[in-house]
A protein has these predicted regions:
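Generic N-terminal leader segments that precede the first folded domain
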Residues: 2-6, 24, 33, 55-57, ...
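Charge- and polar-rich, low-complexity intrinsically disordered segments of small proteins and propeptides
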Residues: 49-51, 74
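Short, solvent-exposed coil/turn linker segments
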Residues: 38, 59-73, 182-183, 328
Length: 448
């Protein structure tokens, strides 16, 4: 981990400051090290260590993508940061090749992400939650990033890769905590509720996504006898579109095609491809869940209760269990469900104009008035992920988004690993272009 000595941190002018060191930031750091070793970059990460989906590392769950769509392979198959090299270095390559599974286990991939991050520890400071961004001009235009601990960091270019914000429906927002949580917090919230109750739990899972089905299966598989209330607006879990033709949406050529399409064409393409990534479930998970429900019926039990075509109309979190008011969407029939824990498998917010979207990442609020917006009020983003300044705003240092651009770049920016390494190269080329390739390691400052 980078040593943060306070004064040096505030005086150093880096070439690049990255906010967020998740998979997107790690992939970019790997590309910078291998392809631009003279460029001085520093990433700020709010967590105390690198992590990938820590709240959803469920036993038996997989990544749903090819193992070589990793942090480096598509950019450089000879990179030491590939998943295969991780397996080689950790002595598990042959064992992995013998596993009868299409995709890597999520727990294995999380270890891979941490392993790569450890190799790049000189490029990151952990425990630094970025809270503010401002623009300064002395000695050259640059960004100043403030953090919750009071330290500030400066960079001639800024890359924002904070990940998407969990989407929490309005009725649930006042109740978030130990008994109502987003799926991204599932594992540790469940552990706390188990400890508090000391017996089987009633858990309501809201949504019909891959995460919703995996959580239902995980609860049923545990030896605690939990009961699951699966609450969904549709008739049931739907099968994910895994056609190789649809999977070509994760090709860089499709990213070019999508980016250059009209707004109407993008909307049409997004609707066509939605079942390949949203509100749908892999076949193996669906089949396992259905067999579990059938087997419960054979034994005279009902531990997975489906509340089909239902929406939540009210939430109460007084003494005792959480009370959810439900309404059947077609008949209007009302009923109530009580739960010791409510898990919201309701997805994440994108950058876009829709009701559930955000116009820009929250961290950019202080500088948003100087950034170009489209006619819907959403950040303009160019093909290399550069966010141009607003006309008349004057000179601005370059700003890039890393992994937040599904609205403009398609499914490759939808939180998947599939194009991470190629996006890192595109970002690197954009940074070089915007800074000027002849300018590197500004001020010659030592890393803090």
């Amino acid at each position: 981990m980078t040593i943060d000595n306070g004064r040096t941190a505030e005086e150093t002018l880096h070439d690049v400051i990255g906010v967020g060191f998740g998979p997107g930031g790690i992939a970019l750091a790997a590309a910078l090290e291998e392809e631009a070793p003279d460029m001085d970059c520093l990433f700020l990460e709010s967590r105390s260590e690198a992590a990938w989906q820590p709240g959803m590392l469920l036993r038996g769950s997989d990544t749903q993508h090819h193992p070589s769509r990793d942090l480096a392979t598509l950019r450089n198959p000879r990179s030491r940061y590939t998943f295969l090299n991780y397996l080689h270095e950790t002595g598990r390559l042959l064992a992995f090749l013998n596993v009868p599974a299409h995709f890597p286990l999520r727990r294995d991939y999380a270890r891979y992400v941490r392993w790569v991050a450890a190799q790049l520890s000189s490029s990151v400071v952990y425990g630094r939650r970025a809270t503010t961004v401002s623009v300064a001009s002395d000695p050259v235009p640059h960004y100043v990033v403030g953090t919750a601990c009071g330290r500030t960091y400066r960079g001639r270019a800024l890359v924002v890769g904070t990940g998407r914000t969990p989407y929490v429906p309005a009725d649930f927002r006042p109740h978030l905590g130990d008994r109502v949580c987003h799926s991204s917090e599932y594992t540790w919230r469940l552990e706390k509720r188990r400890a508090a109750k000391g017996g089987p739990l009633d858990v309501a899972v809201v949504g019909a996504s891959q995460s919703a089905a995996e959580i239902a299966l995980d609860l049923h598989s545990a030896a605690f006898g939990d009961r699951v209330h699966a609450i969904m607006r549709g008739f049931g879990y739907r099968l994910k579109d895994t056609s190789p033709f649809s999977e070509e949406a994760y090709f860089p050529e499709f990213t070019d095609y999508y980016f250059n399409a009209s707004r109407e064409a993008r909307a049409d393409l997004a609707a066509q491809l939605r079942p390949s990534n949203y509100s749908s479930v892999d076949q193996d998970v669906l089949e396992s869940l259905y067999v579990r429900r059938y087997e419960d019926g054979v034994d005279g039990e009902e531990r997975i209760l489906l509340h089909r075509n239902h929406e939540v109309t009210g939430v109460e979190t007084g003494e005792g269990p959480v009370r959810l008011a439900l309404r059947e969407r077609h008949t209007g029939e009302a009923k109530e469900v009580t739960a010791d824990l409510v898990v919201l498998a309701t997805g994440y917010r994108d950058l876009g104009p829709a009701e559930h979207d955000e116009p820009y990442p929250g961290i950019l609020g202080p500088v948003a008035d100087g950034l170009a917006l489209d006619d819907t009020g959403v950040l303009r983003v160019e093909r290399d992920y550069f966010v141009p300044p607003r006309q008349g705003a004057g000179a601005r240092p370059p700003l890039f988004l890393n992994g937040l651009c599904e609205n403009t770049h398609g499914l490759g920016d939808a939180g998947s690993f599939s194009l991470l390494s190629l996006r890192a190269r595109t970002l690197l080329e954009g940074i070089r272009h915007r800074l000027g390739t002849e300018q590197t390691a500004a001020d010659g400052g030592a890393r803090d």
